[in-house]
Every structure is written in structure tokens, then in C-alpha cells.
Design a protein with these regions (language model features):
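Conserved beta-strand hairpin/beta-sheet module of binuclear metal-dependent hydrolase folds
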Residues: 1-45, 128-147, 163
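Active-site HxH/HxHxD metal-binding segment of metal-dependent hydrolases
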Residues: 42-107
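Binuclear metal-ion centers of metallo-dependent hydrolases, dominated by the metallo-beta-lactamase
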Residues: 94, 98-105, 157-159, 174, ...
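Active-site environment of divalent metal-dependent phosphoester hydrolases
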Residues: 29, 61-66, 87-90, 105-108, ...
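Active-site neighborhood of phospho(di)ester-bond hydrolases with catalytic His/Asp-centered motifs
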Residues: 22-23, 53-66, 81-84, 143-149, ...
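Local beta-strand N-terminus motif with an aromatic residue
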Residues: 53, 77, 160-161, 195
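Active-site-proximal loop/helix segments of hydrolase catalytic cores
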Residues: 121-192
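Pre-active-site segment of Zn-dependent metallo-hydrolases
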Residues: 18-57, 68-73, 124, 150-157
């Protein structure tokens, strides 16, 4: 199993011989609702769009997960699996094979990878977007992804999970508090799922941000601090900080309990 971190929330996941592009923002700026004075993300150098993609997986319909300029550059015939909000985005862009997953629903890619949607991040007072469990059916190895650190207690039933992709630092706004939840949330999900590896997401990569929101943001925590917290809580989980753009193999060992069913 190989992964490549593509900055922000974006990953290339190579699992069971399939190449899954997760929440891609690879070209152009990142702006929410065309309000660039509030928040704007840019890349000093654009990422090349990976080729031979078997599936695009989108956790949310917001621009930092379903990034329209990037999605416009990708082949519209690539199958897409996403939250209902994300499905609307790619439908408007003319994608031809779209699967909208509600919480608890599953999609199987070529009888080799099972993708299960779980409750994810809140968007507004009533809407929960998606987190995902990706299971390699031949080995039982499983990846959990929740890009903003909102982990549903329903995940406990799927333990153990081998790899957890989640923020491990907090991004905090005055008065509002953390809107990216790392630290405590990441420790909690580590205790639930007992992962072999945790991979930080959302707050890293070769990107630059500007705008009023960025001036107010405060980051709390670090990978080294979180690794120490895991050890203090007697967890053997290893934190790996990937080099953006560099493909790496996950150092996973088979576990007797990995044969659970979704």
C-alpha cells in the first residue's frame, strides 16, 4: 500500500493495485465563495495531476475537498464517489459516473477495495459531511480518513483500523475555538481504533495562505508532541509526517483482528 501526500487534504492512495485520488486540490488558487480577501490558498508550484486514476473520492462539497478548477482538469469519465454535496459539484461539472454515499453506505471498487461512508465534519447546524473507511479486501488492511478531525463514535465498531488520516494539530479561531480538530480528537480516535500508523492532514504541505482568516488563526500542537502523547497513553501507533509529493510505502503488519467485516 502506497500513499502520496499532495498538500492540504489531498492524497493519492494506491491500494489493491488501484489509484484513488482523495479530495484533490492540485491547480489554481483555493478560495471559498470567491471571497479571496477572507481566505486564499496558493501553491508556489502546482502539483502535476496524477495519471491512471481509477477513482476520485470526495469527502465534502466545499472547495478544499471538491476543488472545481482541479476537477475541471481531470477526465470526466473517471468514476467519482462522494458525499451528497460533493456529488452535486461533480454532476454540475459533467462527470459521467457518480456514486453518492450517505452515512453507512458502501461502494466496492473492482471487487478489491470497499469504501464505507461514516459521519464526518459538520457543515452548518444540520449537515454532516463524510469520513471514509477504505478496506483492501485481499489483506483486510483499512484506512480511515476524516479531514477535519470530527470522528464519529460509530467508528469504534470497526476497530482495529490500520491507518488513520486525520489532523493532529488544532487550528483555532478566537471565540469560535478549533475548526480543525487535532490533539484531543486525534488521541481519542487513536484509542478507539488502535492504528499502526497515523498520517497528519489538512494543515500541511507546500502551500501558502493569506487573508483575514489566516491572520486570526492559531495552530496548536505538533507531530512530535502528538507522538509523545501517544506514547504517554501507551499506544504503539507511529506518526509519519510525509514529504509532500513523495510516494511512500506504509509499514503495515497483518493483525489477527483485521478480518472484521463492514
Amino acid at each position: 500500500m502506497y500513499l502520496t501526500y499532495l498538500d492540504s487534504n489531498s492524497w493519492l492512495i494506491e491500494i489493491a493495485g488501484k489509484r484513488i485520488l482523495l479530495d484533490p486540490w492540485l491547480v489554481g488558487p483555493l478560495v471559498f465563495g470567491n471571497i479571496d480577501w477572507l481566505f486564499k490558498g496558493t501553491r508556489p508550484k502546482e502539483r502535476p495531476i496524477p495519471d491512471n486514476i481509477d477513482l476520485i473520492l470526495l469527502s465534502q462539497g466545499l472547495e478544499d475537498h471538491a476543488h472545481p478548477p482541479t476537477l475541471k482538469q481531470l477526465d470526466r469519465n473517471i468514476p467519482v464517489v462522494g458525499s451528497p454535496n460533493a456529488a452535486k459539484v461533480v454532476q454540475e461539472l459533467g462527470y459521467t459516473s457518480i456514486t453518492s454515499l450517505g452515512h453507512g453506505e458502501s461502494f466496492t471498487l473492482n471487487q478489491s477495495v470497499e469504501i464505507k461512508a461514516v459521519p464526518g465534519s459538520p457543515i452548518g447546524p444540520t449537515l454532516l459531511e463524510n469520513g471514509y473507511l477504505l478496506k483492501e479486501l485481499a489483506s483486510g488492511f483499512t484506512i480511515s480518513d476524516e479531514p477535519h478531525g470530527y470522528h464519529s463514535p460509530s467508528l469504534k465498531q470497526f476497530a482495529p483500523v490500520d491507518v488513520v488520516i486525520t489532523p493532529i494539530i488544532d487550528l483555532v479561531l478566537p471565540i469560535v475555538g478549533p475548526f480543525i480538530k487535532g490533539t484531543k480528537s486525534a488521541l481519542e480516535v487513536a484509542q478507539w481504533l488502535q492504528p499502526q500508523v497515523m498520517l497528519p492532514t489538512a494543515a500541511g504541505g507546500d502551500v501558502e495562505f493569506e487573508g483575514l482568516l489566516i491572520k486570526l488563526l492559531r495552530a496548536v500542537g505538533s507531530a512530535a508532541e502528538f507522538q509523545a502523547t501517544l506514547e504517554q497513553n501507551h499506544l504503539k501507533t507511529r506518526v509519519i509526517e510525509p514529504t509532500p509529493g513523495s510516494r511512500f510505502e506504509l509499514p503495515l503488519e497483518r493483525r489477527a483482528l483485521a478480518a472484521y467485516l463492514f
